[in-house]
Amino acid sequence: MTKKRNITAFMIATMIMLFLLPANAQETKGYVHWYEPESEPFGTLTFYGGDMPSGTSLYELNTGKNNPGWLEHMSYCTKVVFDVSFKDVRPTSCYNWFNEFYQLTEIEGIENLNTSEVTDMESMFKGCSKLTSLDVSNFNTANVTKMDGMFQGCSGLNSIDLSNFNTDKVERMGDMFNG
């Protein structure tokens, strides 16, 4: 009888764990929204966490070496916002996220960008020549292997704090600060 109770208890515990595991293991999805006022030639990219609603000017996060869809707005974006809902999103690639966003002057809420699982930051801010400040002190770069061209062409930056950058796994960082 004791053996039967132990088996029953084990099966119940296993079933409870199986039901709880997916709830804890689920990743928060992220998406990007482009907003351009009708009266303005320039607009804002906002990063959100959660399921992507239906509509226009919405983009999924890129993976690997795929260019992000929002690059089509690179010439017209003056502001990027990371909404607080994006804090639970874990992108694996920031490849080309703001490459050649030469009109970009402001990034708001960058502390809501969790980079703990990012492996590629190649050309992330490349060509953002109008940015004068950039706070990347909260970036977790422990898993990053590619940083080449990350700040290339960011000629307007007055200072940047990289003191928390962990470059132990970085294999490529050529032209990281060129230009």
Where does each model-flagged region fall?
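Positively charged n-region of N-terminal signal peptides that target proteins for export
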Residues: M1-N6
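Bacterial N-terminal signal peptides
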Residues: F10-F19
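Sec/Tat signal peptide C-region and signal peptidase I cleavage site
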Residues: L21-A25
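Negatively charged
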Residues: Q26-G179
